[in-house]
Amino acid sequence: MANMNRALAAIADPTRRQVFERLADGPRSVGDLAQGLPVSRPAVSQHLKVLKAAGLVSDRAEGARRIYEIDPHGLGALRAWLDQFWGDALAAFKAEAEKDPS
């Protein structure tokens, strides 16, 4: 649950969500991610550090640059946690829809 709290806290920040959403298009460098954002490259690096600590992002060296991408394991764990609520909501909806109207 600690990792889940960390992941939820990480994506609670609007700038981090923007960075994370940009990574959904594929791996990118800090410079690429910073383009068009209202924050500096060092700030983007700090946001990536938080996302990485939460298990949502991984990185690799490519020459002198670091390339960041969404970590499917961390994202899968977050999705599985969220899916439990979706499943409960669907079950409740199904039960309501199948009630006898009389």
Locate predicted features.
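Amphipathic alpha-helical dimerization/coiled-coil segments
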Residues: 1-3, 21, 75-102
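Short, structured secondary-structure boundary patches
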Residues: 7, 48, 64-66, 80-84
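Alpha-helical residues within the helix-turn-helix
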Residues: 21, 35, 46, 52-53
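Residues in the helix-turn-helix
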Residues: 43
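N-terminal helix-turn-helix DNA-binding core of bacterial DNA-binding proteins
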Residues: 2-40, 65-76
